[in-house]
């Protein structure tokens, strides 16, 4: 089969302005709740796009860990490629692809580092093995073999068999403060529904976009 022949119709219904909440964070939370209830695999998984100092874009899948009126939160190794990019350019884009619901959400904004207290609160809530993995992996660095990583993990597991695991200084989170949030709902005959929330002077404007 030719790739150009792979297609389907979008039949799960449209999206109208009257259906939208006035605040896009409330609308996002509604859609996220529906994605979770629908049993989607990894409903909190999002594509995170950053740009390096040469203007080259990079993307990767990261899990959303919190969302509130202040923005969208994720955690990472602060020496990772994404974190280094954000040091040079704090502009960022998030994308949630909820394919089974024929929905997408696209967010643009600016990333800010979380406080040490916020980082510690989440780190201590993680499973112990996840805490150890955060210490063992120098994210995005080159390693000779997987065995090196596994050996470091086992070494740390023995070292911290008892007691609390200290949060590494090279680990932390970012809060993405949104500047725009677009909601996309698939429609029949490729007449999809798109609504863009844009923030101006602390208020959200809503525009319908052509598909």
Swiss-Prot record:
Keyword set includes Oxidoreductase = yes
Pathway, per Swiss-Prot/TrEMBL?
Answer: Cofactor metabolism; pyridoxal 5'-phosphate salvage; pyridoxal 5'-phosphate from pyridoxamine 5'-phosphate: step 1/1; Cofactor metabolism; pyridoxal 5'-phosphate salvage; pyridoxal 5'-phosphate from pyridoxine 5'-phosphate: step 1/1
Q: Which Pfam families match?
A: PNP_phzG_C, PNPOx_N
User: Which keywords annotate this record?
Assistant: Flavoprotein, FMN, Oxidoreductase, Pyridoxine biosynthesis
**What PROSITE patterns would the database entry show?**
PYRIDOX_OXIDASE
Summary of subunit composition and partner proteins: Homodimer.
**This protein is called what?**
Pyridoxine/pyridoxamine 5'-phosphate oxidase
Q: What is the species listed in this Swiss-Prot or TrEMBL entry? A: Vibrio parahaemolyticus serotype O3:K6 (strain RIMD 2210633)
Gene name tied to this protein: pdxH
């Amino acid at each position: 089969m030719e790739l150009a022949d792979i297609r389907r119709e979008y039949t799960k219904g449209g999206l109208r302005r009257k259906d939208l909440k006035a605040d896009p964070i409330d609308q996002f939370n509604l859609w996220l709740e529906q994605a979770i209830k629908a049993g989607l695999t990894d409903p909190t998984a999002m594509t995170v796009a950053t740009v390096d100092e040469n203007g080259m874009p990079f993307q990767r899948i990261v899990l959303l860990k919190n969302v509130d009126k202040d923005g969208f939160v994720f955690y990472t190794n602060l020496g990772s490629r994404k974190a280094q990019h954000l040091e040079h350019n704090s502009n960022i884009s998030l994308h949630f692809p909820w394919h089974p619901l024929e929905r997408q959400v696209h967010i643009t904004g600016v990333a800010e580092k979380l406080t040490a207290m916020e980082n510690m609160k989440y780190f201590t809530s993680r499973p112990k093995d996840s805490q150890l993995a955060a210490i063992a992996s120098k994210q995005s660095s080159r390693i000779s073999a997987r065995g090196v990583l596994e050996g470091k993990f086992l070494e740390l597991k023995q070292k911290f068999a008892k007691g609390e695991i200290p949060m590494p200084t090279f680990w932390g989170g970012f809060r993405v403060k949104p500047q725009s949030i677009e909601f996309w709902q698939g429609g029949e005959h490729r007449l999809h529904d798109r609504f863009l929330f844009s923030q101006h002077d602390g208020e959200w404007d809503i525009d319908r976009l052509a598909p």
